[in-house]
Amino acid sequence: MEKKIKNFSSSLYMRRKARKTTAMTHSTISHVTNVKKAMIFFLLSFSHFSSGYSACKKKRRGSGLRYFGNKLWRPTPRSGQSGQSRPKTGPHGSQRVVFLELKKAQRWA
C-alpha cells in the first residue's frame, strides 16, 4: 500500500511538472511568433517604401519623378508632357499634382 501511494504522488508531481513546462513552451512560442510577425511587418513596410524610393531614384519608365527630401519635384517639363506636368491652378492644386504623381509612382513601383 505504501509503495502505491508513493508512486501516485510521484506521478502527480511529474504531471504538474509537465504542465508547467508545456505552459512555458507555449508562452515562449507565442512570443516568438509575435516577434516573427513584427519582423515580417517591418520588412514588408520597409521593402514597400524602399521599392517606391528606388523607383523614383532610378527614374523608371523615363518619368520625370525624383525624390528630393520627402517632396516630389519635377525637372523642367519635356515637350511631350508639358500639359501633364503643369501644376493645376485653384485650391489644392499642388496637392492634387503630388497625389497624381504618387499614384503614378506606385503604379510603376
Swiss-Prot record:
Deleted gene: phenotype: Insertion mutation in a CDC34 mutant background causes altered bud morphology.
Region of interest called Disordered, as start-end residue ranges on this chain: 67-96
Biased composition (Polar residues): 78-87
Top-level division of the source organism's lineage: Eukaryota
Protein name: Uncharacterized protein API2
Source organism per UniProt: Saccharomyces cerevisiae (strain ATCC 204508 / S288c) (Baker's yeast)
Gene from which the chain derives: API2
